[in-house]
Amino acid sequence: MITEEQIHTLAKKKRVNETVIFREYLQVFFLSRLYSRRESENIFFKGGTALHLIFNAPRFSEDLDFTVELEEKEFLSFIWQLFRDLSKEEAVEFKERKSLAGKRFLLTAAAGVLSYKTFINLDFSFREKIFEPQKSIIETDYPVLFTSYVYHPSKGEVFAEKIRAFVTRSKGRDVYDLWYLITQGARFDMHLVKEKLRYYDLENISEDKILKTIEGFSKKDFILDMRPLVPINERDKLGDLFDYISDYIKNYLSRKNQ
């Protein structure tokens, strides 16, 4: 269990508020327990939080996202047992929430070390497969011990999923994540992008359409979405960062098509 003093120290070190630190502690705690179990070899951690914790993206993230390659009945039996066990270790509870696809649960941490509740959405998708599975070690500043690997998609597959996320929901964090992945050597694989878009019946989308969608994203929306996810001292720089990131991505996609 993390202490109030540890939260305060880490918040000062990372230059974020204490809610961000406690939420990330809960994320890391959940992952450590999930991946200590055999069934987790078929549960792949993805999305913005995976990008932060596995690929070291600077921005923080709010939810936990997974692709599951288990039968739904087997998964539900496994996950509810995990929830029961976690509730014995920490003052947390889990409730299923409505979801248009897959399964969504809400992790709620009771007021304790913080004077208010903390919430994390846990999203599990069953309708797709992971094409490039990998496993990694998570190193953390939090008082959490990992004893096993974390399973996840490759950097390139995360990039393809981020393009899909941007095309289907258009959030500032997706623009940021695309830029970060490019700087880390991720490559634009249109075949993989189309495979990811197939689940939304968008596999016929063109590269030009993707570029125009990115070009049409507003600076205001980028700033509003990113403010809670970056250190306090970086928030005033988000407008300039958006201009740089937008040009960087456009130049990358333009060079790729030459």
Feature-to-residue mapping (PLM):
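Structured mid-to-C-terminal alpha-helical surface segments
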Residues: 1-43, 54-57, 69-258
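Glycine-rich beta-strand-to-loop/alpha-helix junction loops that act as flexible
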Residues: 46-49
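Active-site micro-motifs of SAM-dependent methyltransferase domains
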Residues: 51, 66
